[in-house]
């Protein structure tokens, strides 16, 4: 059926800020969909609240709104734009839930807006547990024994009937939010109570546990003519019980017999036909390893994380095809853009193995609960392609950037037998390393299979890796064995370790023996048809399919997996860098390992190499392509860390030179540069051991800010107030970066602001200054940022501009740099300089309309600001106010403290823009899902040093009409100052929560919590109590404030929205 001509304007809803369970894959899907619809001649209107995305660039849709995805704002936009249709299946759960709300409130009907793609009734059938159960029963597809509970008591009755263990799945939530596996009634009570609160329809599915079954996924497509295909099937390394987003996944499936494959394929197609899905859909199934019994786990009736992985694994662009199906086109009339010959009806065939491994945030959250279950915890993922399981798995392991280059980890090597067994049985993020170590220790794989329920086929592959290791140890420099090791994914570093030589020596011997990788094309058809996709992976075979062109080439290094501190913002900068290179007529080559992002869409760059971002893997591509040089500025710390080794190997680093990157990153060199430039910084020193750190802190004076050098996202950074805490830190956290010293700085609690600057070597452009709402001490990535600044005097602004110019020129910056300042007692100090693109680039690019990454790339390639029409200095400020707000994923991370400090904790960001600060703040809070009720109770439990400041806020809350609740000390202080306060009991370290503030939060008697810990390391009881209070507020979805500056901001909003009532 040809595309529809009765609709002209289509609105797409994006997925909002990045949280665990809903990450960059939706930027990739949304970008693809917008471009596909524009390609077919439709006018596209986009609504998304996340500025850090390519999707929200002006050129992706015809009209872009960066506004909160709430009923209030989306309705307003619908009324203003009057689109003919709405496409909701590309914005993750956020987009789907919004469409449901718009439909149920009658707005779509009122405005005569049609929903495209999968019908709402089908979405309801797939998402509503009861309706889905009825559907599966009607088509004879087996589900787990289950029932729906709307109360805790109902859940207990159902569990008693089915028998423990039980799986709890809240309805209409994403990434397994609020769910879990329960072995006891006590666990069930706790998980169901939380799950009911998080489910928008107050429903939980209580189902039998099939933990231990194989988990298989099918990515399927269907059109309105009922044509349906399987794009890709995938198999989880971990059995059922671990969320698929956290599991290691292989594509295509590896252990299924042909009968099993066909049986599950038929079931997936049966379901998609019955649901009448139009577009992409993900079906998850569980297969009993000992019989042909299977269960349908769930269906995602939309583009998902798995579809992004399937798209990159096969080269088949699922989101693009889904968008075309939504406008009435059928699979047999859409051309496959990979081959440009076959149609979209043609099922992809793979002649390689793809491995995906999740990237977890536990390097930042050492106290986080690492146990993996049905609730997702990964922030990102990596993908690797190889000709066998061993190769793809080991390439994926070294793509993770967790300090390992092989499937071995120091902690696992040092573990005793008891710990090995415990870590194998427990499903944790690092289980692969302990299972591998157990095999090295000689534990039979049959025993491991029995303990872990991991298929013996996968364990046999790990055993094969161990056998190659053992052969390498005793056959040093043997060329045939070296070739075998490389074919199975071994890195030069691992071989060097086994041979006790340097990686350079291994590389030299490889090249001498002509053991070099070839690059194979990802073509969707296992080379059956000729394909022209410039999408490659390395392997050690004969024929090289990546042909070098005659054009001048630039290699751009991506930023690898998404993690806290290095998010989608860096991918945004990478994509814009590529566009600028292409505009200058050069060939842009991207190297990256992240399947979720726009930069790894093969249609973006001239060539894409899906490879780990390690020296060896990058160098192999450079050897083949012989580029003019490499750009490292846009790939975050990942790319910056490769600058030095690449430069030493004779590779030209374009833009700011390696010695100048070093001057910004190395403490002593940076201090000298600041002295030479006459720019003040907070007093500080470096220390290489505990005694040196104590001596330095005593000299500088407490409080001090302490951190390792060369880190991103404030890793292992703390504010320390006394010697005892400092010694504790040095013993606990200093291993964060062993090769580099620890930095000890005077902690100035002033106003913080930051600047992104672009320099051509002579002139410096400052697109804007961002002012942070939270004072120094809260990581810049976790601070709310306001542009243009609202509280800086002209003298301070002039000083910031002057220091920025001096630094950019003094550090020989070519391209981009980011500088963070603190203003303390009217004096401007430089805290740090990052000689690269920072996480604020997308936000500032959007609000100033200056394409910063593209401009910086033009500088790197030799152009200058003046010729491009830009004046040096601070760019003119617009008349709107823009606020960037951090977004956190604490609901997914049990035992992670939400108290904000110098270590970054946010996973994403949202933006609010309006004509006044108050309105922009309101939008940013709404977009970040920090919604304050118009009235209710606010609970204060604050540190002694914060009580004076809290008094003014308490008065303001009372004035608006809020009731005040506080713990004893805070309550007494507020009462003394004439306020009416209801006093609640502290926990005092006890287990009994009855009558305490925690019970108040749990029972919904409190609408907001203000909890500060002050600057001294609190006593264990106070610290534990504070942690439990914060956890309770987060799990109940109650706004929590751990910084008084954020409280001041939200009060500004509430005051601007409330009327004053005074008697005459």
UniProtKB/Swiss-Prot annotation:
Mg(2+) 4 binds at residues 832, 834. Residues 930-1064 form the MGS-like domain. Its cofactor is Mg(2+); Mn(2+). GO terms for molecular function: ATP binding; carbamoyl-phosphate synthase (ammonia) activity; carbamoyl-phosphate synthase (glutamine-hydrolyzing) activity; metal ion binding. Residues 133-327, 671-861 form the ATP-grasp domain. InterPro entries: ATP-grasp, ATP_grasp_subdomain_1, CarbamoylP_synth_lsu, CarbamoylP_synth_lsu_oligo, CarbamoylP_synth_lsu_oligo_sf, CbamoylP_synth_lsu-like_ATP-bd, CbamoylP_synth_lsu_CPSase_dom, MGS-like_dom. Pathway: Amino-acid biosynthesis; L-arginine biosynthesis; carbamoyl phosphate from bicarbonate: step 1/1; Pyrimidine metabolism; UMP biosynthesis via de novo pathway; (S)-dihydroorotate from bicarbonate: step 1/3. Keywords: Amino-acid biosynthesis, Arginine biosynthesis, ATP-binding, Ligase, Magnesium, Manganese, Metal-binding, Nucleotide-binding, Pyrimidine biosynthesis, Repeat. Pfam families: CPSase_L_D2 (PF02786), CPSase_L_D3 (PF02787), MGS (PF02142). It catalyses: hydrogencarbonate + L-glutamine + 2 ATP + H2O = carbamoyl phosphate + L-glutamate + 2 ADP + phosphate + 2 H(+). Residues 402-546 are annotated as: Oligomerization domain. GO terms for biological process: 'de novo' UMP biosynthetic process; glutamine metabolic process; L-arginine biosynthetic process. Mn(2+) 1 binds at residues 284, 298. The keyword Ribonucleoprotein does not apply. Large subunit of the glutamine-dependent carbamoyl phosphate synthetase (CPSase). CPSase catalyzes the formation of carbamoyl phosphate from the ammonia moiety of glutamine, carbonate, and phosphate donated by ATP, constituting the first step of 2 biosynthetic pathways, one leading to arginine and/or urea and the other to pyrimidine nucleotides. HAMAP family: CPSase_L_chain_A, CPSase_L_chain_B. Composed of two chains; the small (or glutamine) chain promotes the hydrolysis of glutamine to ammonia, which is used by the large (or ammonia) chain to synthesize carbamoyl phosphate. Tetramer of heterodimers (alpha,beta)4. This is Carbamoyl phosphate synthase large chain.
